[in-house]
């Protein structure tokens, strides 16, 4: 399940982010491709979580690695509608020791993204990286 994140969710969500939020041109077929594939992978996780409390059976690095991407689904434009198992797991992950502290390293992006001016600055800086 860690490899599922490394070879599936990580790359697909990363590209969904780039093309949905940061790429200078909006290329809808590309955006759709990455968002739809991310959604399909979310459905795989949702099915796995229908019979397991944690992705690999017991709480593990697989949960942490996958959660880092699942929790950003809105930012990437990926719907979690109808994925109750995945949504419950995502919310339960916030309660795990160290998770709230960890997502604030190196900066508290969730706070930044709540402020429109800070959000614009964050996107502008990310777009600079995409253009390189």
Where is each model-derived feature located?
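Active-site cradle of extracellular carbohydrate-active enzymes
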Residues: 2
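GST-like fold's C-terminal all-alpha helical module
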Residues: 5-98, 102
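Acidic/histidine-enriched, glycine/proline-rich intrinsically disordered or flexible terminal extensions
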Residues: 106-132
